[in-house]
Amino acid sequence: MSLQEVLDKIYTVPEAAETLSIIRYYGSKCKSIVEFGSRGGISGIAILQALLDNKGRWKPTFVAVDLVEDDSIKKLRDIAEKFEIAFHFCRGHSRQYPVHECDALIWDTFHTGGGFLADVQRMEPWIHKYIFILGTRIDGDISEVTRRKLDCAAVARELQISEDGAKQGLKPAIAEFLKTHTHWKQVREYGEITVLERTVPPKSLFPIRA
């Protein structure tokens, strides 16, 4: 069974299928993708398909980061091995993940504006092309904390952000990020996904001394 057949079998709802096609379209322009919040594995299948679309001389790379390694992660690893895509899983908090260069970041952890800003502001100097944010409709105006009526102080401590950040929705956080990072622009918003694109290449992170 091809990866596309797997996607077709998993998602028959038009909006869900379109979300995956957006990941595949922009992801196919990438050689390395990092995903924060990989549990469930659905977006991961689209990432693998995107990297397969762009497979060339060098192995593409997919790094999945999550607090839990469930069966879906193991399935992603098996699929990646089958199609010769380098797959790495990092168990832990996204805030502790070591930064490195990549073409794209897919962000789908606990949906709070403060969490998004903390993760993305740390990672963005290393991201060459795209940032995908999932959950921007259901938790766009208010955060997952507010929507689910969770203990804001406890969540803020767990996510290492302020209580205001835990209450902030994703859309105002994205607007705040774009205002202070003018080399990024929003290029797509559909359903639960928003895509940001870097408009200016990142500065050399490893400058050569004269």
Question: Predicted regions span which residues?
Answer:
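A short alpha-helical cap/connector motif
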Residues: 1-210
